[in-house]
């Protein structure tokens, strides 16, 4: 047999209850798999969303979804063929018939009839549905073709195999035997693939390799996997496929092994107190994992098992058996009596006859405004100082039986007899108290006591007819010392700016509002920026203390000068009132016109005329038109002309070519009232050409040293100081060789030097006053040249007195100054005398022989020295005394 003949002998699936013959599949034809469908419903009342059954349409394109349509608007057919109820439905007849339509890929229309039977009316399974009570058969063959279902050639087409869940075994258990007609030609081996075979969960289904028996190895769970799709394979002994793979669909049928589960353990809802019967409160929901399409294992019914409290009636609420909506069934809900209800709700499958579970529903009765706020107490008293706003007078207390912090509890206060709006009541959000305050200042002199009537309500209106509570509040106004009041608060006075100094301008007084007090008012000026005014402290009369000036633009704005006046009473405490005085200063012609600018530049070549503005600080008519005139010979070189009809500016230009330099021009300006003034213009002629804008005067050289010169001088001084410092350091480092003060022992010189004359008698009583008078000048001229003298302050020596009687005091004071003078002789330091003096009559002492000499000393020459050395000659010469 050739390859084409072998492929035409397709696999035959033999499902053997008896010997069915294999037949070759026919071409696929679109259509419903049954001409009619019959579904059974449990009762005559169906809720919205109830699943009735499923129809199936084959369009031969392999699509999983199909568009269905029904003329009966009570039902909905999904794209998967599931028929559901669109709205609540009640059966008036035991049967309902309607048609379901579908279209194939060529838009041909097909229809099937659907019949709904209530329980008890010919109740039997629909003929097109496979049994779910167990395994259909051990052996099956290809079913005969029908107008509603056509098989494509070369395909294995078998109905789904149903297998109940939760079977007890023993396992493995046979499901169906698969046979190929090729087993007559040779040995055929069978295998399966797909979910449950070689993909997770692996090993749920197995097939005997040689016999083709498909078996299940363990209990199935529909809630885990509802459908298994397997593919069977047939191969020869050499491993070659003898048939194409065949799809096997295994459907797990449901058992009621799952009880309903509420979506929440505790459901919470609320209802207004006093709600009418039929008012929906809340909805509870439960789910069931069992099949809710083909069985009633997931058909849940709701009931209320208990209610706590059972007051005022044990059945205050009811629940919709199918939807779980809880509603009010009787009147009497009162939040103040029973604020909450707790219901135990049950959900049971099999329409309430199967497995069940419970949950709790907590219903809160919300408040309505059925209790009015009541004042407690109903009378109040308070005091408030006059003239003070936003002052708390008293606190109003109310009680309300409604729920706190709700609109039915929040109080709203209203003053019934406050036409002037002088009081206000606000609500404390914490305790609902009313705070009575003044909205504006009260006047003790106008009214000393107020009696107010206050009513209280709630934010929301009363739900029932209730009486509004009211309270009476007595408010006493306390008198306080009030500040004097200026009348008017702002006073305008017109005065000429040339008003005489010391004259009274006006009188600005204040009134005392405290009519029950006798007080004295004192006036003074609080602000007078120009220091022009003074006031009589008793009468309030205001006069000038200096000349007024309207053109003082620092203090006068828009011809108005502002001063602040205060009035102080002598009450306790002292009160002060303020008034504003506005002096409107009228203008006088006290300012002559002036030119602007006063410094002007011209170019030497081709100069352009310059415009000069004329400015007058006065007001019209004391201003323009102005008159301009060149004076003091300025018209010889310059000319002016008016620039505008109002003569508020002039044009200045030279008459001839001028040399570069500075010029002074005298310009006389006069206003409309003949007030004139001569002003000197500074004119500079620059070395340039054209308009004045391009003319720039050379910058003068600044007098004195410039910064670079100053820096150079400072640098030179610094360099000189550094040089001197280096020289001093060099001199200090040089080794100073000094002669010893005493000769060494081996260098004895027997020379005698004459150091002045020692004779002459006692001279300590003969002093020269000029030496004392000279002070520091009396120091010897012999100074050290090896030690720099220390700079110290010079002591103060008294001058020689004219009176001889004071000479003693003069000597004592100057002696004290000399004793503390470190620069006065004698100096406490060794002095090196480079010059010993000349013209001494005595020979040098170095000629004397030392007493340590070995030879005899000859001292006879001492006799030749005169009387001053006679004593010495007698001592050493051996001569006798006279």
From Swiss-Prot:
Signal peptide: 1-22
Glycosylation sites: 280, 285, 358, 470, 472, 509, 558, 570, 576, 578, 580, 622, 637
Membrane topology note: Single-pass type I membrane protein
Marked site: Cleavage: 364-365, 700-701, 731-732, 750-751
Tissue: Expressed in granuloma macrophages (at protein level). Expressed in the skin (at protein level). Expressed in the liver.
Transmembrane segments: 710-730
Posttranslational mods: During apoptosis or with calcium influx, cleaved by a membrane-bound metalloproteinase (ADAM10), PS1/gamma-secretase and caspase-3. Processing by the metalloproteinase, induced by calcium influx, causes disruption of cell-cell adhesion and the subsequent release of beta-catenin into the cytoplasm. The residual membrane-tethered cleavage product is rapidly degraded via an intracellular proteolytic pathway. Cleavage by caspase-3 releases the cytoplasmic tail resulting in disintegration of the actin microfilament system.
Keyword Membrane among record annotations: yes
Residues engaged in binding Ca(2+) 3: 288
Residues in the Cytoplasmic compartment per record: 731-882
Reported impact of residue 838 to G: In an ovarian carcinoma sample; somatic mutation; loss of heterozygosity
InterPro entries cross-referenced by the UniProt entry: Cadherin, Cadherin-like_dom, Cadherin-like_sf, Cadherin_CS, Cadherin_pro_dom, Cadherin_Y-type_LIR, Catenin-bd_sf
GO biological process entries: adherens junction organization; calcium-dependent cell-cell adhesion via plasma membrane cell adhesion molecules; cell migration; cell morphogenesis; cell-cell adhesion; cell-cell adhesion mediated by cadherin; cell-cell junction assembly; cellular response to indole-3-methanol
Binding site for Ca(2+) 1: 257
Cleaved propeptide residues: 23-154
Assembly information from the UniProt record: Homodimer; disulfide-linked. Component of an E-cadherin/ catenin adhesion complex composed of at least E-cadherin/CDH1, beta-catenin/CTNNB1 or gamma-catenin/JUP, and potentially alpha-catenin/CTNNA1; the complex is located to adherens junctions. Found in a complex composed of CDH1, RAP1A and PKP3; PKP3 acts as a scaffold protein within the complex, the complex is required for CDH1 localization to mature desmosome cell junctions. Interacts with the TRPV4 and CTNNB1 complex. Interacts with CTNND1.
This protein's domain notes: Three calcium ions are usually bound at the interface of each cadherin domain and strengthen the connections, imparting a strong curvature to the full-length ectodomain.
Designated name of the protein: Cadherin-1
Gene: CDH1
């Amino acid at each position: 047999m050739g390859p084409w003949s072998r492929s035409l002998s397709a696999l035959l699936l033999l499902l053997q209850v008896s010997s069915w013959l294999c037949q070759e599949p026919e071409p696929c034809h679109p259509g419903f798999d049954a001409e009619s469908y019959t579904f059974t419903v449990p009762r005559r009342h169906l809720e919205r969303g109830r699943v009735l059954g499923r129809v199936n349409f084959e369009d031969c394109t392999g699509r999983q979804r199909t568009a269905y349509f029904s003329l009966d608007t009570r039902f909905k057919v999904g794209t998967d063929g599931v028929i559901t109820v669109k709205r609540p439905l009640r059966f008036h007849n035991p049967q309902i018939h309607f048609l379901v339509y579908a279209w194939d890929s060529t838009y041909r229309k097909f229809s099937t009839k659907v019949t709904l039977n209530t329980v008890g009316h010919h109740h039997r399974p629909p003929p097109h549905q496979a049994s779910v009570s167990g395994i259909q058969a051990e052996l099956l063959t290809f079913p005969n073709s029908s107008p509603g279902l056509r098989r494509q050639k070369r395909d294995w087409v078998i109905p789904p195999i149903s297998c109940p869940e939760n079977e007890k075994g023993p396992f493995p258990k046979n499901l169906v035997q698969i046979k190929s007609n090729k087993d007559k030609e040779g040995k055929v081996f069978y295998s399966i693939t797909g979910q449950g075979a070689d993909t997770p969960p692996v090993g749920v289904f197995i097939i005997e390799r040689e016999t083709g028996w498909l078996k299940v190895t363990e209990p199935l769970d529909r809630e885990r996997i509802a459908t298994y799709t397997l593919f069977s394979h047939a191969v020869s002994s050499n491993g070659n496929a003898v048939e194409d793979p065949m799809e096997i669909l295994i459907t797990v049928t449901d058992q009621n092994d799952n009880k309903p589960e509420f979506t929440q353990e505790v459901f919470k809802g609320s209802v207004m107190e006093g709600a009418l019967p039929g008012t929906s409160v809340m909805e509870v929901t439960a789910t069931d994992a069992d099949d809710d399409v083909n069985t009633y294992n997931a058909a849940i019914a709701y009931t209320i098992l208990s209610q706590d409290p059972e007051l005022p009636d044990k059945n205050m609420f009811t629940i919709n058996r199918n939807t779980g909506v809880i509603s009010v069934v009787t009147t009497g809900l009162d939040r103040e009596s029973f604020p909450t209800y707790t219901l135990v709700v049950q959900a049971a499958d099999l329409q309430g006859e199967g497995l069940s579970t419970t949950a709790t529903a907590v219903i809160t009765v919300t408040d309505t405004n059925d209790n009015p706020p009541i004042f407690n107490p109903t009378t109040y008293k308070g005091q408030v100082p006059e003239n003070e706003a936003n002052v708390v007078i008293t606190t109003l207390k109310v009680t309300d039986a409604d729920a706190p912090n709700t609109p039915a509890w929040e109080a709203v206060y209203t003053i019934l007899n406050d036409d002037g709006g002088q009081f206000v009541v606000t609500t404390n959000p914490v305790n609902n108290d009313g705070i009575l305050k003044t909205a504006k200042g009260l006047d003790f002199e106008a009214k000393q006591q107020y009696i107010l009537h206050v009513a209280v309500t709630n934010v929301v209106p009363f739900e029932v007819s209730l009486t509004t509570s009211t309270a009476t509040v007595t408010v006493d106004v306390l008198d306080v010392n009030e500040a004097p009041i200026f009348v008017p608060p702002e006073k305008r006075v017109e005065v000429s700016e040339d008003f005489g100094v010391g004259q009274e301008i006006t009188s600005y007084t204040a009134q005392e509002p405290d009519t029950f007090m006798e007080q004295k008012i004192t006036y003074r000026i609080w602000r007078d920026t120009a220091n022009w005014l003074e006031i009589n402290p008793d009468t309030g009369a205001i006069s000038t203390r200096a000349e007024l000036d309207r053109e003082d633009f620092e203090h006068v704005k828009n011809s108005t000068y502002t001063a602040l006046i205060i009035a102080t009473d002598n009450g306790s405490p002292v009160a002060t009132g303020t008034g504003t005085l506005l002096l409107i200063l009228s203008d006088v012609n006290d300012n002559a016109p002036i030119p602007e600018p006063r410094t002007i530049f011209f170019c030497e070549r081709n100069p352009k005329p310059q415009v000069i503005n004329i400015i007058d600080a006065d007001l019209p008519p004391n201003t323009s038109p102005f008159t301009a005139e060149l004076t003091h010979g300025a018209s010889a070189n310059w000319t002016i002309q008016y620039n505008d009809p109002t003569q508020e500016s002039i044009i200045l230009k030279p008459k001839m070519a001028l040399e570069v330099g500075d010029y002074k021009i005298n310009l006389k300006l006069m206003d409309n009232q003949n007030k004139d003034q001569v002003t000197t213009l500074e004119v500079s002629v620059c070395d340039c050409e054209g308009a004045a804008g391009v003319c720039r005067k050379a910058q003068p050289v600044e007098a004195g040293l410039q910064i670079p010169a100053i820096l150079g001088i400072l640098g030179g001084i610094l360099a000189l100081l550094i040089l001197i410092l280096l020289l001093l350091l060099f001199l200090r480092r040089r080794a100073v060789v000094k002669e010893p003060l005493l000769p060494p022992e081996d260098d004895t010189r027997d020379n005698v030097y004459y150091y002045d004359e020692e004779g002459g008698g006692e001279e300590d009583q003969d002093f020269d006053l000029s030496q004392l008078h000279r002070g520091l000048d009396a120091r010897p001229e012999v100074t050290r040249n090896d030690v720099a003298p220390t700079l110290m302050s010079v002591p103060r020596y008294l001058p020689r007195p004219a009176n001889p009687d004071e000479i003693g005091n003069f000597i004592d004071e100057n002696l004290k100054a000399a004793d503390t003078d470190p620069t006065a002789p004698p100096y406490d330091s060794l002095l090196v005398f480079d010059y010993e003096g000349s013209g001494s009559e005595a020979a040098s002492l170095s000629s004397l022989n030392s007493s340590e000499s070995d030879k005899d000393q000859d001292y006879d020459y001492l006799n030749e020295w005169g009387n001053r050395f006679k004593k010495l000659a007698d001592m050493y010469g051996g001569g006798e005394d006279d």
